[in-house]
A protein has these predicted regions:
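Low-complexity, glycine/proline-biased repetitive segments and flexible coils/loops
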Residues: 2-23, 32-300
Length: 300
């Protein structure tokens, strides 16, 4: 190959062949985002065929504003699944932040669990679960309600919600003992939607005549069951609602990400998401499921 000679000022540069362009390397750019984490709701206490169980606690609710991130950097994103009967919900995660799964409700064979919001207690002396566990500021959830109020045939406590403590059971006669309502969830400033309501506690009766049910908290909490008549209902999917007292599952959580409309979010293959259309200067993405705990989102 014949070398070429290029003159530059008073000197020259000798080389071989043709110069190749230097590839462009994207430079990370700082940006700010808002995001919401709602963990999976706790399952209702195991009714063992009879719904003598406290409601599950709503998943932890944590909202973050004006958080600094960089483009070209992958960030972990995980949506927590709801807990099965007598099982806590699973955590939701973005980057290094997490919301804790809701605690399961109590039943005659075991106590309620602590969690994002605590599970409801029962009439057998099993205490309600403690919310905001682990502790965050602001609080990610509240305690479950107390069961067996007044003694005798009192009902079961409602699960705590992200916005309020679970309701205590009410006591009349054995045929009129109601479970406590699930604690209300919290409203997201990003979406305006209420999430992470607690599940209603089960009603206890020994004469099969009381079919009154305790409602779940606003934000997807399931309805409590009635002993010997009906199991409770599950927490609603993608709300983090706790399951109603009696052989129920909590609802799955959700991750919401709000970014400037000049930017785009790209998710890894195991992420189920929707949204992303520009509106009012922003794009809002809803992440409703992740297939592994190693899924990511990258901004550009």
């Amino acid at each position: 190959m014949t070398p070429f000679l290029t003159t530059t000022g008073g000197g020259s540069v000798r080389g071989f062949g043709r110069r190749r362009p230097v590839p462009s390397i994207p430079i990370p750019i700082a940006m700010t985002i808002d995001y919401l984490l709602v963990a999976g709701g706790g399952g209702g206490g195991d009714g063992n065929g009879g719904s003598r169980a406290g409601g599950g606690g709503g998943g932890g609710f944590r909202e973050f504003a004006a958080q600094s991130v960089s483009t070209q950097t992958p960030y972990t994103v995980t949506v927590g699944s709801g807990g099965a009967s007598y099982v806590n919900g699973n955590n939701s995660v973005f980057a290094t932040s997490s919301a804790a799964g809701g605690g399961h409700g109590a039943y005659y064979g075991g106590g309620a669990a602590d969690g994002g919001s605590g599970g409801g207690g029962d009439l057998y002396g099993n205490a309600a679960g403690v919310g905001n566990t682990p502790s965050t500021s602001p609080s990610q959830g509240y305690d479950g309600g107390i069961g067996g109020v007044g003694g005798g045939g009192g009902g079961m406590g409602g699960g705590g919600g992200a916005g309020a403590v679970g309701g205590n059971s009410s006591y009349g006669s054995r045929g009129a003992a109601l479970g406590g309502s699930g604690g209300a969830g919290a409203v997201s400033s990003i979406t305006g939607t209420t999430y992470a309501g607690g599940g209603g506690g089960a009603t206890w009766t020994d004469n099969n005549s009381n079919n009154n049910t305790a409602g779940g908290g606003a934000g997807g909490g399931g309805t409590g069951g009635v002993y010997q008549l009906a199991n409770g209902t599950n927490g609603s999917a993608n709300t983090g609602g706790g399951g109603g007292g009696g052989t129920t599952s909590g609802g799955s959580g959700i991750v919401i990400i709000k970014i400037p409309d000049t930017r785009t979010a790209t998710f890894s293959g195991g992420v189920t998401s929707s949204g992303g259309s520009p509106s009012g200067g922003y794009k809002i993405y809803s992440v409703t499921a992740t297939s592994t705990t190693n899924e990511t989102v990258t901004f550009s």
